[in-house]
Amino acid sequence: MAALKEDRSYGLSCGRVSDGSKVSVFHVKLTDSALRAFESYRARQDSVSLRPSIRFQGSQGHISIPQPDCPAEARTFSFYLSNIGRDNPQGSFDCIQQYVSSHGEVHLDCLGSIQDKITVCATDDSYQKARQSMAQAEEETRSRSAIVIKAGGRYLGKKVQFRKPAPGATDAVPSRKRATPINLASAIRKSGASAVSGGSGVSQRPFRDRVLHLLALRPYRKAELLLRLQKDGLTQADKDALDGLLQQVANMSAKDGTCTLQDCMYKDVQKDWPGYSEGDQQLLKRVLVRKLCQPQSTGSLLGDPAASSPPGERGRSASPPQKRLQPPDFIDPLANKKPRISHFTQRAQPAVNGKLGVPNGREALLPTPGPPASTDTLSSSTHLPPRLEPPRAHDPLADVSNDLGHSGRDCEHGEAAAPAPTVRLGLPLLTDCAQPSRPHGSPSRSKPKKKSKKHKDKERAAEDKPRAQLPDCAPATHATPGAPADTPGLNGTCSVSSVPTSTSETPDYLLKYAAISSSEQRQSYKNDFNAEYSEYRDLHARIERITRRFTQLDAQLRQLSQGSEEYETTRGQILQEYRKIKKTNTNYSQEKHRCEYLHSKLAHIKRLIAEYDQRQLQAWP
């Protein structure tokens, strides 16, 4: 579309595409070849009788684009469909269309929120073009470079000492052997032969074992696996038998074509495989700890066995990353995140935009619940299989876990859990928010502690601040005069005073889920986690959609001066939105409390599994 001009105002309208219309908006990610096909068709579409078409088949489909050079033929590109709103509640955005009205004015129209993403898969010509570009770049580099042989370098077979006899002097020991010069070319050939003999140790092994030990480190695509096998030597017979072998020992992913070694095959992996480097052996050690601690009777995971873990999840040091690797669609909620310590006191922090503040500026919905102790160091957990992997990016449960990447230090760091009192989600509570606050003069049920003059002055200064800065639902003594009793918080959150900071009853999951002592118990906990995580994600997505409008209005209100006309108008919009949500979402309060409960429960199960994996890794010889 045309670029927007500076210093010019545009009107933005919504609703041209109603909810009952047949128009859907998608976020489309094209490859270079697909983009060129579209541009070629648009440039000469008048001369082509066919029209582009798109067909959906579940979460997959294909796009057909006519070729101007061959009017009777069309290029077909396959794609897969992913849900942005479900995988990442904060990653969706709106689709804006720019058009010119009949009067010649430029308008912007919001067509709706983009919840789905179409990703076009790469074709063979894309890989062929990439290979040609790499070969051309390598040839140019080789033509401008030269091999410099240095003393002690890789091309020098051994150090040679040249000894010149003294002139005119006879050798006192005729039988002494003298060092003779060594031809440099022969030394290079010998060193190359020794390197080949080292690699031949792997090439002489059975082809099945070679494939099995490569897949034990990380998932491979078939093309990547062929390139890796060719380094150690690959015959045509082995190449032809690769497809059948992969069906026996690996799980094939229908989405990105990656091959992951089956869990039952890890028992045949040798830790002293000659093709493994020291780093590969350390990586294999961590993988075996995770795989072998699970009961073999469980077989594959609860999900589709073909849904193997994404490439790059394990063993990134084994081979360099590939350009066309697809990013993983999910992130393990039990995976290790960067070490982070929560600092929550008895007075809960104000909730802003539906989330609790974190000292380092990042956003977290909840601290990790822990046992009734001051702090509790959570042992880092190795990655779990894909069924436990929830959607990525800003996941509320992922925020309470540690992710140390794949640097080989998975179990050397920990996360400090929050104290036992659980802070509730700072999201709009549509019930029990209109209770009037207690006047200052009313007696309290329990006698408060005496406070120093310094603390009293601080509290008095905090109370004198404008109410617009406090995320409160209930009107208080210092509220704006004339505000109705059901005035919501300016960002849609409940009063901090309405959020309990402690509980008199022990949650049922603390009694049900104790420390893990066996692999069967660990598998049972993991199954319980998988059973309730989908419900938690759905609840969180619905709550996020409700609070998004309050977040936008709160940001506008903070930029206005209190008492101005714009301030009162925005405040009226907040009240209107609050009443609207209260009517249309009668079960919001129950869903919010259910989401908080599931968050604490799943975080507790995650911590127990992480501690068990840490103990298993420490006990590994």
UniProtKB/Swiss-Prot annotation:
Tissue: Expressed in all tissues tested. Highest levels found in placenta, skeletal muscle, testis and peripheral blood leukocytes.
One of the protein's GO biological processes: in utero embryonic development
Residue(s) carrying Phosphothreonine: 180
InterPro entries noted in UniProt: E3_ELL-like, ELL/occludin, ELL_N, Occludin_ELL, WH_DNA-bd_sf
Purpose: Elongation factor component of the super elongation complex (SEC), a complex required to increase the catalytic rate of RNA polymerase II transcription by suppressing transient pausing by the polymerase at multiple sites along the DNA. Elongation factor component of the little elongation complex (LEC), a complex required to regulate small nuclear RNA (snRNA) gene transcription by RNA polymerase II and III. Specifically required for stimulating the elongation step of RNA polymerase II- and III-dependent snRNA gene transcription.
Record's disease association: A chromosomal aberration involving ELL is found in acute leukemias. Translocation t(11;19)(q23;p13.1) with KMT2A/MLL1. The result is a rogue activator protein.
Protein name (Swiss-Prot/TrEMBL): RNA polymerase II elongation factor ELL
Organism: Homo sapiens
